[in-house]
Curated annotation (Swiss-Prot):
This is D-alanine--D-alanine ligase. Residues 141-346 form the ATP-grasp domain. Mg(2+) 2 binds at residues 313, 315. One of its GO terms (biological process) is cell wall organization.
Amino acid sequence: MEKKKIAVLFGGQSGEHEVSLMSAKSIINNLDKDKYEIYMVGITKKGEWYLYRGDVGKIETGEWEKEGIPAIMGASTKYRGIITFEDGENGFYPIDVVFPVLHGPNGEDGTIQGLLELLDMPYVGANVLSSALCMDKVFTKRIFKEAGLPTPDFVVVYGKEIEDLEAIKKKIEHLGYPCFVKPANLGSSVGITKVHNEEELPGALKLAAKYDRKLLIERGIDAREIECSVLGNENPEASIAGEIVPSNEFYDYNAKYFDGGKSLLLIPAPLPDEKMEEVRKLAIKAYKALDLRGMARVDFLMDRNTGTLYLNEVNTIPGFTKISMYPKLWESSGKSYSTLLDELINLAVESHNEKCREW
């Protein structure tokens, strides 16, 4: 049987560049080499694209950049693949499916998806619109509200507004403290601060504004952090739910990736059966409301006192590192990492085949 040619995209111009490298290494190591011919395509923080043929271990360390061959992804629908530029000569490598492992802006926000749509190339994950909606936490929450799905109260602040601190304090008065200040367009909890009082607000606003001109200020809830993995196109399925018990006050960037395993990942989450089922049903409702394809990790907050569930956010390219919840939840639900990757690739082909091309 002829092997499918898979291009794994990693790196990117994003604050989550390093997380992408970790996820890509894990995915490449778990793709079945008997089924797939793998092409590793890295994007530097400067936006330079390279085809990398070296040791997978050098991806996570960043050493791959020294050994990459300058490349671009296609030039038209006639050339659906990787074009390289080496020693004055061009090379062309046809690709069957692209697996974007690009977390955050310029990868998870619809930009790469738009490029791949123009090239008519099958790709893993959500389409342009759904990717963009989920990348922007404000629009995600507005979709939740429109669909009648529960999400914490919030206020939106734009860059220049942070100069008028008193106006912001008045604007968020109804939220109370603690509250969370977040960049609207970033993942992995980069730039997020839990604000306990007015004195902590200016620093939190300045930090978030480093990453985005649009900021989300959200009511703080004394909550357990619950996550559920969703897989599928028209008929998605939800995994069992897991719970994160962070080593820090909340599951921030350092707790996610650099705390040496001090945060606890409880799989399955210690929930009553009916609450577990509620999580799974709500995850699928959120997935459908956002018209998602392929995969997503749906994150919840569950009020410790009332047990009420709130949708927090949706990640269309969730982490795939060795400690990431998305593959771990599926493994505990009966799908091995390699089987999960097989299904994602098949779903990408299915989505591509369903597109209308009559014009």
